[in-house]
């Protein structure tokens, strides 16, 4: 009987400790003030605009700066490319953009202000490597991480929006 009381008390203690630990782990990360959130949102929107400019001007230095070393992107076709592959493709000039613009961007902030996700629309037009005109509209989702004081895009995906 003494053993069962000790076991029951030990089990009760472990259950309470587990419950407290679970509640502690479920707490949100450090809260971000509204001013910090607004600054992060503005910064991510600016980076999206720079990304569009990179394609318009074939400026790989922008992408070198804003894409993380392990960056991966999935295009509407399902084709996947890394940072190195995306920059190499822009350097070869396979496509020449006359339009490259992101719009309707919504930014969400997570992880105490260290992670952001932006969702928006993207319109691009120009000529492909064979001189054939193209025009595409897509909706994108990008994941940004704050590391060493700078925002870097680690992953993105675009889905085609049919033109009417």
Spans of features found by a protein language model:
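N-terminal secretory signal peptides that target proteins for export/translocation
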Residues: 1-7
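Compositionally biased, low-complexity segments enriched in small residues
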Residues: 2, 12, 26-29
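Bacterial N-terminal signal peptides
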Residues: 10-22
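A beta-strand edge to alpha-helix "cap/lid" segment located at domain peripheries
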Residues: 25-65, 72-164
